[in-house]
Amino acid sequence: MSMKYLMLLFAAMIIRSFADSGNAIETTLPEITNATTDIPAIRLCGPEGDGYCLHGDCIHARDIDGMYCRCSHGYTGIRCQHVVLVDYQRSEKPNTTTSYIPSPGIVLVLVGIIMCCLLSVYRFTRRTKLPIQDMVVP
């Protein structure tokens, strides 16, 4: 991957975060500029990009000739044409029924380990006699 492509992806993520927060207006989006010129490296597409992205915003990069899409939540693809599967979206939020299932299993394993330890201590103390017990005469 070239450095310019990585910069394009990073800038698209920054622009997306501003747009998702509801604070961004097209004229107030941050512009990443090259040190030698004042032409923005990434800008929103003009009228030529209308309808290019099916479910998202069109971005035009100066260094990479072409239009790219910044997809809305729930969509993916080159032109944001694919819907993200429901199972994938569900996996972002923990499901309450599946998050409590491991709890009884963990408790049972811990109880089993404690019982094994107590049983081994009991057997060990039963087999060995302390010297004090030999000295006591009935």
From Swiss-Prot:
Domain of life: Viruses
Disulphide bonds in the chain: C45-C58, C53-C69, C71-C80
One cellular component term from this protein's GO annotations in UniProt: extracellular region
Glycosylation-annotated residues: N34, N95
GO BP: any one term: positive regulation of mitotic nuclear division
GO molecular function: epidermal growth factor receptor binding; growth factor activity
Induction pattern: Expressed in the early phase of the viral replicative cycle.
Record's subcellular location: Secreted
UniProt keyword Thylakoid, yes or no: no
Signal peptide per UniProt: 1-19
Domain EGF-like: 41-81
Keywords attached to this entry: Disulfide bond, Early protein, EGF-like domain, Glycoprotein, Growth factor, Secreted, Signal
InterPro entries: EGF-like_dom (IPR000742), GF_C11R (IPR011170)
Record-stated family: Belongs to the orthopoxvirus OPG019 family.
Known function: Stimulates cellular proliferation (hyperplasia)and mobility around infected cells to promote rapid and efficient spread of infection.
Descriptive protein name: Growth factor
Species: Rabbitpox virus (strain Utrecht)
